[in-house]
Amino acid sequence: MACITSFVTTFGQRAFRRPLTTDEITRYSAVAAQAAKDTNDVWQGLEAIASAFLQSPHFLYLTEVGAPDPQNTARYRYTAYEMASRLSYFLTNDTPDDALIAAAASGALLTPAGVEA
């Protein structure tokens, strides 16, 4: 079960371009565990999860909902992970690499100076 949870966490972050919530990790891990149990093959469980991730709207669409701006709650601004996705697709036409994900996780992409770096 630990390897399934590790796969869900790692693959899910790459597929969704953001960290998964605890609820998402629990749901996807349960689906993988059930598929592995039903087929008696852990690889079938991982295949079911990969298929579920690749069919999710979070993978298929680039969502930019944003979060309330702390200085002006009537406005919204991109979250750090949304900014990482926006930059990566603009510059490389691909998902964020490890450096952009790390910058998003540290909060560096929430400032103009961090985006320019």
What label would you give each PLM region?
Residues M1-A117:
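Composition-driven recognition of low-complexity segments enriched
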